[in-house]
């Protein structure tokens, strides 16, 4: 190829870390873990008005096909082992979004004997979405924040 032909072509220069971060953030497949009224708002996000497909987000029915878990609602003590089991079945790398006051810290039922005071006591949480219940826009903002976090995280570690 002549130098004149190469000058006309457009090249994109980047690092492997930026490329992998872009690919991971652009193809998030969430596993929904709806426990209460926040799950209804999570369903709104999946509808046509917000169109998560444009962000590369497709809800998956199996934890083995997912890389993001959205915990939406009140986590009780009996459900905590199931949450951990589903989290452990997800392949690495995996991320967790805690959606709503109940998932974040127990919410209205904080002092109940049967409620876990935050799902971060069971699984590590990457993004907290506040609200009771949070709006679909708030969850969408949380998903965008998780995408930004994934892009910033180094992929290759020495």
Swiss-Prot record:
Gene Ontology cellular component annotations, sorted alphabetically: plasma membrane; respiratory chain complex I
Any one GO BP annotation for this protein: aerobic respiration
Database matches in InterPro entries: NADH_UbQ_OxRdtase-like_20kDa (IPR006137), NADH_UQ_OxRdtase_20Kd_su (IPR006138)
Subcellular locations according to the entry: Cell inner membrane
Membrane topology value: Peripheral membrane protein
Entry cofactors: [4Fe-4S] cluster
Binding site for [4Fe-4S] cluster: 37-38, 102, 132
Keyword Transport carried by entry: yes
Cofactor note: Binds 1 [4Fe-4S] cluster.
Job of this protein: NDH-1 shuttles electrons from NADH, via FMN and iron-sulfur (Fe-S) centers, to quinones in the respiratory chain. Couples the redox reaction to proton translocation (for every two electrons transferred, four hydrogen ions are translocated across the cytoplasmic membrane), and thus conserves the redox energy in a proton gradient.
PANTHER family: NADH DEHYDROGENASE, NADH DEHYDROGENASE [UBIQUINONE] IRON-SULFUR PROTEIN 7, MITOCHONDRIAL
HAMAP family for the chain: NDH1_NuoB (MF_01356)
Family statement: Belongs to the complex I 20 kDa subunit family.
Subunit structure: NDH-1 is composed of 14 different subunits. Subunits NuoB, C, D, E, F, and G constitute the peripheral sector of the complex.
Annotated protein name in UniProt: NADH-quinone oxidoreductase subunit B
Provenance organism: Legionella pneumophila (strain Corby)
Gene responsible for this protein: nuoB
């Amino acid at each position: 190829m002549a130098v004149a032909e190469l000058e006309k072509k457009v090249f994109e220069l980047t690092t492997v870390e930026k490329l992998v971060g872009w690919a991971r953030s652009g193809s998030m497949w969430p596993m929904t873990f709806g426990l209460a009224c926040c799950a209804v708002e999570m369903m709104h996000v999946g509808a046509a008005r917000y169109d998560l497909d444009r962000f590369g987000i497709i809800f998956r029915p199996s934890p083995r096909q997912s890389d993001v878990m959205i915990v939406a609602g009140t986590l009780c003590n009996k459900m905590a082992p199931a949450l951990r089991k589903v989290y452990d079945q997800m392949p690495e790398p995996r991320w967790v979004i805690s959606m709503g006051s109940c998932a974040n810290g127990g919410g209205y039922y904080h002092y109940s004997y049967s409620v876990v005071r935050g799902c971060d006591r069971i699984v590590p949480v990457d993004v907290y979405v506040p609200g009771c219940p949070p709006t679909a826009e708030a969850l969408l903002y949380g998903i965008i924040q998780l995408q930004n976090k994934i892009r910033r995280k180094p992929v290759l570690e020495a």
